[in-house]
């Protein structure tokens, strides 16, 4: 039985310091490369983000790694990037992961996400809409924007860290 097709969507803007680590972590997944497509949707970076993505897309092709596609997002914002990515998905895509260009994942990340999704779907007898994962603190210093995001998510208007409340595996109701 072949592995379900997975697409990883990565909206980017000015990610030259992080995008290589992000993409390499996806290129080195234990999940079959033939069943994994990576869509990087760039919002007009003026640093070397686009050049790094182009270089890694070529490298991944040469190494029979996952397909990496770079798309231009003229609207710049993440919701537009998501919508644009949907137009480029392979028709047999079953699962979509979204990452940020600052993130990287362990080599078994996609394999574990797909297995858990299939397990939960099998238990409840239907497809489900989403699967979260625990965010592990970075080993890099938190930059200004990261500090803003952290402060926003932990304040009452940002949800007071609601995402951290859901720790069990399985279907759950969200507020």
Show where each model-derived region lies.
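Cell-envelope/extracellular polymer assembly enzymes that use nucleotide-activated donors
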Residues: 5-7, 37
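Acidic helix N-cap motif at the loop->helix transition within catalytic regions
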Residues: 17-20, 47-56, 108
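Short, acidic, metal-binding catalytic loop of nucleotide-sugar glycosyltransferases
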Residues: 24-35
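A conserved acidic beta->alpha catalytic loop
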Residues: 42-51, 102-104
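Glycine-rich, basic loop-to-helix element that forms the pyrophosphate-binding segment
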Residues: 73-89, 112
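Short beta-strand-to-loop acidic/aromatic patch adjacent to the donor-nucleotide binding site
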Residues: 93-104
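Conserved donor NDP-sugar-binding/catalytic core segment of glycosyltransferases
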Residues: 108-147
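A recurrent flexible, glycine/aromatic-enriched loop bordering the glycosyltransferase active site
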Residues: 160-175
């Amino acid at each position: 039985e072949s592995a379900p097709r997975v697409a990883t969507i990565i909206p980017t803007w000015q990610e030259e310091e992080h995008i290589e680590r992000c993409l390499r972590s996806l290129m080195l997944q234990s999940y079959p490369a033939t069943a994994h497509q990576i869509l990087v949707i760039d919002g007009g970076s003026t640093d070397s983000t686009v050049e790094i993505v182009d270089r890694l897309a070529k490298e991944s092709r040469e190494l029979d790694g996952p397909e990496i596609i770079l798309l231009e997002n003229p609207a710049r914002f993440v919701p537009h990037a998501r919508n644009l990515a949907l137009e480029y998905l392979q028709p047999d895509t079953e699962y979509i992961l979204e990452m940020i260009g600052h993130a990287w994942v362990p080599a078994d990340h996609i394999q574990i996400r797909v297995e858990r999704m299939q397990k939960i779907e099998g238990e409840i007898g239907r497809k489900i809409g989403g699967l979260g994962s625990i965010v592990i603190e970075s080993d890099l210093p938190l930059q200004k924007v990261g500090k803003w995001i952290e402060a926003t998510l932990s304040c009452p208007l940002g949800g007071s860290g609601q995402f951290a409340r859901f720790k069990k595996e399985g279907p759950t109701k969200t507020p």
